[in-house]
Structure formats: structure tokens, C-alpha cells
Amino acid sequence: MAKKNAKNSKNSSASIARNKRATFDYKFEEKLEAGLSLMGWEVKSIRMGKVNLSESYVFLREGEAYLFGCTIAPLNTASSHVVCDPLRSRKLLLKRKELDKLQGLVDRKGYSIVPISMYWQKGAWVKIEIGLGKGKKEHDKRDDTKDREWQIEKARTIKKAVQQ
């Protein structure tokens, strides 16, 4: 029996998880890439796609950044001798200059730090894209929805005109 080709495997895509709610609720001014400090069972679970970023956020404590609220469900077979906490806070690996910049903006200007997506880099490293931004008001969300619907309607109209 032949082995599966790694390129055709379902788990070989670079993207692991996306926080779709983040782009709807926040207007990002800057995006950063950060590494994650993970345990072995977490990496195995991430490879199987058992991760949820929807209610997670980043907080800064004692000069370090932590990812909180990210759920990584443990596999039944991967961790029999280790106590697995799916909601534990995970340390983000950022440079000191980036941490200082984030701390200053969060403290002084009221920015929020929210995870946007999690992905594989070079097939071995789990990276997380975090966004630095402010929360949108209700009218901003409505404006974005109107713009998106207008773009879809415009594309449909153009497509119909080209087909005729």
C-alpha cells in the first residue's frame, strides 16, 4: 500500500484556525506575527485541527504576552500521563521591542490585542497572527456590512452584463 503524499493530506495546509469574529468586531491598525510556547500534546491536537480561537484574547503581564481563552482540545490517545488543561494561558514569543510597543499602546491609547489566525510556518512552527486595534461601534459594523453587500451586488451586476 502506498503512503499518502504529504501535499495531498488534509492537515498539510498552512492555515490552522481563524478568528472570524475578530475582523468584524475590531479595526486593526497593525498586525504582528508571534510564536507560541506549546506542550507536546497541544502540537498533536493542533495537527488534528482541534483548536478554537473564537473567544481568545492576548493580555500583557510582567512584560510578557499571553494568549488566553484559546481552546486546544486534547486527544484521547496523545496524553495519558499528562494532565491536559485545554484553556491554559500560553506564552507568546515576541521580541522585547515589540512587547514594549504593545504595552505602551494598550496602556495609553486603549488598544486591544486580539488573535486573528493560527498557521504553520515552514511546516514545523506554529505561529499566531495578532492584531492591534480598537473595537468597532455598532454603526461601524453596519457600514462594513453595507459595503460588503454592495461589493457583492456590484460583482453580480457586472457578471450579468458580461454574460449578455
From Swiss-Prot:
**Which keywords has UniProt assigned to this entry?**
Cytoplasm, RNA-binding
**Which cellular component appears as one GO term in the record?**
cytosol
Enumerate the Gene Ontology biological process terms. trans-translation
The source's superkingdom equals: Bacteria
What is the annotated localization of this protein?
Answer: Cytoplasm
Q: Which GO terms describe its molecular function?
A: RNA binding
Function summary: Required for rescue of stalled ribosomes mediated by trans-translation. Binds to transfer-messenger RNA (tmRNA), required for stable association of tmRNA with ribosomes. tmRNA and SmpB together mimic tRNA shape, replacing the anticodon stem-loop with SmpB. tmRNA is encoded by the ssrA gene; the 2 termini fold to resemble tRNA(Ala) and it encodes a 'tag peptide', a short internal open reading frame. During trans-translation Ala-aminoacylated tmRNA acts like a tRNA, entering the A-site of stalled ribosomes, displacing the stalled mRNA.
Q: Entry's HAMAP family?
A: SmpB
Q: What family is this?
A: Belongs to the SmpB family.
What is the protein named?
SsrA-binding protein
